[in-house]
Amino acid sequence: MKTKIRRGLLALLVCVQVFPALNAQAQRGADRLFSLPPLERAVACIKHYEGLHGPKNHPYVGYGHRLLPGERLSCAMTRRQADSLLRADLKKRLVTFRRFGRDSLLLTVLSYNVGEYRLLGYGKQPKSRLVQKLESGDRDIRDEYTSFCRYRGKELRALRLRRRVELALLYEK
């Protein structure tokens, strides 16, 4: 019994000494990330959450690019090619959302993951509440933005975390 308590106390002591160092390292990383221009933050965020897709992720290649009909891209692309493809995709989407001004990059990143039509609507798909709020001039969008955290009808904690990180990195007050 005493051995278990000693081990527990030793583990606690190690945690108390190690975690502040890890926290300081994480803070330096966050400072570096926030020192980047917004587009670079968006690219870093997408790369982190999407990862480099392989053959099992077809029809997605690179960092989440969805192959379009007639496109002949291989999943065996280099990181540099995938980065270039990601940036080209983001620039195309930025044009679509430029009317939202300082929120255009945030909407671009969200649309890269969920699709433009989930936000803007198309046919029977209505505009999202997020876009409706922004169009009316209301920028209190945290709840609407983080509501895009469902996959196949189920809420995923990882997606909710991703939305919070995107907001923290890209939302301009």
Show the residue positions of the predicted features.
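Long, amphipathic alpha-helical surface segments
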Residues: 2-5, 12-13, 23-53, 65, ...
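Short N-proximal segments of mature Sec-exported proteins
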Residues: 104-118
